[in-house]
Amino acid sequence: MRIFYLLIFLNTLVLSVLAQKNTRGKVVDQDENPIPFVKVQEPETGNVCYTNDQGEFVLNYFESDSKLTFTTSGYDTLRLALPYDKYTTVFMSAKENTNPYHMGFMVGFLDFKNKNKNKNLENMTYFLGESDINRQLQMLPGIEQGTEGYSNLFVRGGEVDQNLMLYNGTPIYNSNHIFGLSSVFHQRSIANTGISRGMSSAKYGGRLSSTISLESSKTGSYSGVKGELEITPINAGIYIESIKKDLSYFTLSARRSWIDLLIPAESRQQSVNANIYDYQIGYGKYLKNGDKLDFSFMNTRDLYFVSLQTTDTANGNIPITYGITQKWYNVLASVNYTEQVTSQLKRVHSIHYSSYKNKNDYSQETYDFNLLENPLVEEKLQRGIRDIGLKTDWEYAFSNEHHLSFGWQNTFRQFLLGANNLISKNYPNQSDIDTIVGNPNYQTSIESSFYGEDKYFFSKDVTLDAGLRATIYSFDGYTKLVAEPRFHLTYFLQNNDVFKAAYNRHNQFVNQLNLGRSGSPDNIWVPATGEILPQNSDILEIGYERKLGRQFSGTVNAYYKNMQNLSAVSNLNDASNPEKDWKSSVVQGSGKSYGLEFMFQKSKGDFTGWVSYAYSKSVRTFPDLYANEFLFTFDRPHMLKVYGNYTNEYSIWNFSFNYLVGSGQLFTLPIGKFRDINGQLQLEYNTLNNYRSPLYQRLDISAGRKNINSS
């Protein structure tokens, strides 16, 4: 009976909380792009809340005869009366002289996230005419490209595989075309980009360095169809969107390289061929009850083929053809169902699929006219990774002081560590061979996470995000339970300056073995095991942001990151050989990085841009590689980045430039040589990464002309 009364009490309590009066809605700009971190306040009572990343808000205990104020940096303050229990779209106007073509990143006042609308990414200088999301991110302090010309992302002393890159919530395992010279994302299909450089909410996990969120265009302030065609020195592309306002949307984005089409078809099949493509499809429908269904699909592929002919003079000038083919591709798909349970409670159910596979084929065919069939040798090596994810995320506006988010996430991840199909046939006096070396079967790991987070508004000046993420990981009999606390404190000073401090802990249960170069398609994704332990990191960061007049803003950030169980390859030949156990070629160590970052932006007027400077240091300790601590390969203590853009909505010309100057890249060079007791010449090294190349500088300048329709 006591249990019965207790259940009645709890049910009454829950219903009373859910029945609180409130007003809710979404804050957008004039193009209906969501505006995050807008302060929504009821002046009469002091009740206040902030919009989330989707621009949505819920304000409780609302007095029907009062007006709400909407304030945020860069937009005119708005006062508006809103009705009870209705979802209202609130439009805000940018302040006078704000340049809509500004490419600057908006810094989050309530967290450490940098966000940007990609509407005018084409105004930025770019490589061979290709607007590139990754190169845009490389212009932020603390994010480096590594090797010159590549679109890799090394965030605050971390490796490429330590970035969680999400396309509409689905992880992508290789984001590069052309061996890293270009990213796989068509800039026109990406509406918003957000990056958290280590400080992310409890909702995200599984990587040490960053969370990068790429969202495709899903809304529009009109009903109709529009499209774009483009051609660059690399690709030809098309973008189509069909929008029925408040009902549904459909988007299609596709690119393909075109230079190979100039080569005769016979040559492409027999001698040389290289092409890339990617396409993205999005569809969404708004249901009658206010719920929403979204579908997203993405496919990318690179293909490179070379065939060489030679003559075996030792055996009667017999022609021999050698062929090398490399192909890698991504396939991503996701379905999201957004459900508004009550005016205060929203949940999103999601399922996603992500697959990456790399194939390397080698063939040797001998044209011996004395034989009925040509002798043939082939090697077909495959490696890859794929996962299926299920998750449910809840957002609950419990009160104006407490905004809760919680949920669970399940990922079934499968690894193809290396399967080499060896074929030999049609050789005289030899039996045909068709065998597989390595393991052709996928090996499965399971990663289950539960998280909860409370955005607690102590007062109008102080906000605390306190979260906890717990993950259970299992693979091949190895099980690990980890807890990841997340704390973000925000303090608004009287002059609207912002001070922030945060602590995050992260764990990573996948590693990418670098077989020569970070970001290469040949690198192998491997699971954490009982021998190769999961990576983890602890990160501390403080930040200060200030508005400088109406046109300028500045930020300063300092961070310290400690990393454990980092992985490195000790023997490249054994690690790349599918016949051998990859774990025997991997050693683990630790690392740390720290730095100080400055960023100064101008967002208004015809000329906009930013200047950033970062001082940083990143070191590694791998006792099995070298006894002492050494610098991380992509450690660059000093880096200055300048971006400028001159344009306005009436000008037919756009001018922009990027300038980077900083410390050179590290290499390992011998300091001497000697002969051992057997008389063999040996090289002497004093440490790893002991030589730094000269000062690095790069300047990119672009000018563009656009047609303006005066009708």
Task: Identify the role of each PLM range.
Residues 383, 387-391, 438-444, 449, ...:
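Outer membrane beta-barrel strand-and-loop segments of large Gram-negative receptors
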Residues 41-43, 71-75, 83-125, 134-135, ...:
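Short, acidic, small-residue-rich periplasmic hinge/interaction motif at the N-terminus
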